[in-house]
Curated annotation (Swiss-Prot):
Superkingdom per UniProt: Eukaryota
The gene coding this protein: RER1
Renumbered residue ranges of the record's region Disordered: 93-143
Name of the featured protein: Protein RETICULATA-RELATED 1, chloroplastic
Taxon lineage: Eukaryota, Viridiplantae, Streptophyta, Embryophyta, Tracheophyta
Biased composition annotated in UniProt, kind: Gly residues: 110-127
Task performed by this protein: May play a role in leaf development.
Length: 433
């Protein structure tokens, strides 16, 4: 545990006024905000001699600014200085020295410790700036998601409401704690009407996405509604009078589209990362699994403390999600087209007609779905997620949430119309339809 001793201002040193050795023996780290050495007669400027149990390599200093001492005409102001056992090279009058256990007098005659400190003093500045960056990031996360609640606080809140947390959330509360906003959102959502409340308690994938983005279900519903309406309109226009005689083809397309819509939105949706990552450390593909788990959910996912992504990770995400999209498309196409082909074959075994359209090839149709989702849909939905993130973070959307909802409806409608026309072109070019 680190104890911090903060000295705001020292105007002079006397034999009895301040004993730096005694004060600093109780601390491994302290800060001197401003030190003034008066050059007036009768006041003796002294060097501070420091003892520390840490080696000089583990101690550092950083300059954090300057603090001009007003009203001290004969005084000299030293820049603000965060001290960890090694002097700043710019402070020639302030020469703290280290005692590695051999002892040193109050006047700082232990030159070996001081020189050792100078060897590593330059590297401390970077560490200090990194600490400040982490502190700012933690403050930003706490402002957005609330403080981290410890296990006792979590249990107190859940017991007050008479609710039992899922196992993974309990483990997270015991190990690292849970953000207050995530906990309160879960407690509210798990009490929703069926089936949402049931799914929040039993399906971690849905729960984590709802905790990170409460509008997740709205986006899924918007995607399904728009795609179903557009598909129905296109099928009626294309098939005309044969729509009902070819209804099984329409039903197969609608079924595949429903599953695909959920996958398109869900695979790119941000999700709450609760607790420590639970990636298996053994197995043939352990490194690959760990790398995939560290990727963002989409190319344009926002960074948060403890959730930073490099450019290479974002590029890799595009190809990784494309592979997942392609797998979903191939699987859904195989099942959906397979069902449609079985229905068509059964009907034609009972009654044949010269106007019957050819039965689409099964594997070629599934492959078309896979390639289309992996390339076209992947690129379009990555862009949509990025645009939605920009709009949702805008001042207008925060003041009027309907703005973000209207944008979601509009951009996804335009995407469905364009994607439908593009799929028809791809199907014709491939010879599947």
């Amino acid at each position: 545990m680190s104890i911090s001793l903060k000295i705001s201002h020292i105007s002079s040193f006397s034999n009895d006024g301040f004993n730096s050795v005694k004060q600093c023996r109780v601390s491994q780290r302290f800060e001197i905000r401003s030190v003034c050495f008066r050059r007036s007669p009768g006041v003796e400027s002294r060097r501070i001699h420091l003892n520390s149990d840490l080696s000089s390599r583990n101690l550092r200093n950083r300059c954090v600014g300057s603090d001009v001492v007003t009203g001290e005409i004969s005084g000299r102001s030293i820049p603000d200085w965060a001290y960890s056992g090694v002097k700043d090279e710019t402070l020639s009058d302030l020469e703290p020295e280290l005692d590695d256990g051999d002892g040193g007098d109050e006047n700082g005659n232990n030159d070996g410790g001081g020189n050792g400190g100078n060897g590593d003093g330059g590297g401390g500045g970077g560490d200090g700036e990194g600490d400040d960056g982490e502190d700012e990031a933690d403050k930003a996360e706490e402002k957005e998601f609330g403080p981290i609640l410890k296990f006792e606080e979590v249990m107190k809140e859940t017991e007050r409401r008479g609710i039992t947390l899922p196992e993974d959330m309990l483990e997270a509360a015991k190990s690292v704690g849970i953000r207050k906003l995530f906990l309160l959102r879960y407690l509210d959502l798990q009490g929703s009407v069926w089936p949402l409340g049931f799914l929040m308690r039993s399906c971690a994938m849905l729960r984590n996405r709802m905790l990170a983005d409460p509008s997740f279900l709205f986006k899924v519903g918007t995607e399904v509604a728009i795609d179903s309406c557009c598909a129905t309109f296109a099928e009626v226009q294309k098939r005309g009078e044969d729509f009902w005689s070819e209804f099984e083809l329409y039903a197969a397309d609608l079924l595949v589209g429903l599953v695909v819509d959920v996958a398109l939105v869900g695979l790119l949706a941000p999700y709450a990362r609760i607790g420590k990552p639970s990636v298996a450390s053994t197995g043939l593909f352990k490194d690959l699994k760990r790398a995939c788990a560290s990727l963002p959910s989409s190319v344009f996912e926002a960074e948060r403390p403890g959730c930073k992504f490099s450019v290479n990770q974002r590029i890799a995400t595009f190809f990784y999600k494309g592979l997942l999209y392609g797998s979903v498309g191939f699987g859904c196409g195989l099942i959906g087209q397979g069902i449609a082909n079985l229905i068509m074959t059964a009907k034609r075994s009972v009654k044949k007609s010269e106007e019957d359209v050819p039965i689409p090839p099964l594997f070629e149709s599934a492959a078309l779905w896979g390639v289309f989702l992996g390339l076209s849909s992947n690129a379009r939905y990555q862009i949509i997620n990025g645009l939605e993130r920009v709009v949702e973070g805008s001042t207008a959307a925060k003041r009027i949430p309907v703005v973000a909802m209207a944008f979601t409806v509009g951009v996804r409608f335009a995407n469905n119309v364009y994607g439908g026309m593009q799929f028809v072109d791809w199907a014709k070019l491939s010879g599947v339809q």
